């Protein structure tokens, strides 16, 4: 039975996780994400799950990794400073192909920054925060409903591609309250277990899609798990250049080859747009209003909302660049995804940035003024 609720975005993330089958949460309180931990502490025991408050964010993500290898779905939630502490384990999860979800409710930064104010300043950290070559998936909600929906999708993507998936929220979306619809059931992608008996199983031998089968500890399969370069059996193989190349290339290709399948964008009024406004997360709310105001003023403006910043939706952004003469990137930082748009649109469209820091969202009038300026 479908039900409606009037709740915060953070609460919606927690409820989305439960609906998606999450049965383990480890975390450490940090503003503005703490409500997720509080809600998980309330909901998980009712579902037979486990909530653990760890000593810090390093331990939190380590605990999630361990729980996932025991066979459950796991998640943590944090904000900028805690996200920084998690980066070593992000790389470990990528190397060991551990499917998990991290919710980052972004706040003003760097360092301690603005704990109670909003930002989108962790977007590049989500992609490049840990050392080495690897790929992750990130989603960026702009509403409370999307906090629920994107968290559900994050778990399914994590299981499908055996990769850390990040839900990159912000203080505005995390703390706003809106009416949302929660279905009685959601589509859950089951983890792909072994298709051969234990004596024939190679834990990191990948089929054509590049994603290995994954048993749980205790299922009777031998599963060496190491952050070292490893062979298909999971055993350290760090001195083998060809083996390292083969492994890391597969870790990247299993995401990049499916980029168009993973990518999710929303477009409005872009068919005839001379100026396309590109945004993600909370600023998209102001962008939609500003574009409508621009149309009322006779300006052919449209907008492209990026729901999956990573892997970057190159196909959709390139199409927007070819279609429009000018692109305007709106984000709550001094320019992060702006550089990705510039890279993809090079030689096809003029790209401008409307940044915003200080903890506040763009007002529609600010965006409209920039659109009008670009239309001259």
Swiss-Prot record:
InterPro entries: 2-oxoacid_oxidoreductase (IPR052368), PFOR_II (IPR033412), Pyrv_Fd/Flavodoxin_OxRdtase_N (IPR002880), THDP-binding (IPR029061), Transketo_C/PFOR_II (IPR009014). This is 2-oxoglutarate synthase subunit KorA. Its EC number is 1.2.7.3. The gene is korA. One of its GO terms (biological process) is organic acid metabolic process. It comes from the Archaea. It catalyses: 2 oxidized [2Fe-2S]-[ferredoxin] + 2-oxoglutarate + CoA = succinyl-CoA + 2 reduced [2Fe-2S]-[ferredoxin] + CO2 + H(+). It holds the Pfam family PFOR_II. Transmembrane segments: none annotated. It comes from Methanothermobacter thermautotrophicus (strain ATCC 29096 / DSM 1053 / JCM 10044 / NBRC 100330 / Delta H). NCBIfam families: PRK08659.1. GO terms for molecular function: 2-oxoglutarate synthase activity.
